């Protein structure tokens, strides 16, 4: 009674039709990311507005994909991702992004 490995579907195979969902959490508020790119900043033009004097008008951009990345858009104070001061980083589920004095949590999930 040994299982036949050839007949088992690999556990890592994504379910058909499952899409990865992306969102960020700022101060407990969830912001769905529905486009390929999301600009965070203090400006009303930003996709997600962060009302923080340490945040530039167009501070940084999150680009979803495999992998998702974040890019500093020439902000005054830069970005810190998972404790590293950087201009560009790869994001994973649970990444902590600090812009100004605001912490943004990046989240992604299948389906």
Segment roles from a protein language model:
Residues 1-22, 111:
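Low-complexity, Pro/Ser/Thr/Gly/Ala-rich intrinsically disordered linkers and tails that serve as
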Residues 18-20, 27, 34:
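A short, polar/charged loop/turn motif at coil->beta-strand junctions and beta-hairpin connectors
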Residues 20-24, 77-79:
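Short polybasic amphipathic segments
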Residues 29-108:
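Forkhead-associated
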């Amino acid at each position: 009674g040994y299982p036949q490995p050839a007949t088992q579907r690999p556990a890592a195979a994504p379910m058909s039709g499952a899409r990865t969902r992306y969102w960020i959490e700022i101060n407990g508020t969830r912001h769905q990311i529905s486009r390929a790119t999301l600009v965070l900043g203090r400006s009303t033009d930003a996709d997600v507005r962060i009302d923080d004097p340490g945040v530039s008008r167009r501070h940084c951009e999150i680009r979803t994909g495999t992998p998702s990345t974040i890019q500093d858009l020439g902000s005054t104070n830069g970005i810190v991702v998972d404790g590293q001061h950087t201009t560009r980083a790869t994001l994973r589920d649970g990444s902590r992004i600090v812009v100004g004095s605001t912490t943004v949590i990046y989240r992604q999930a299948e389906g």
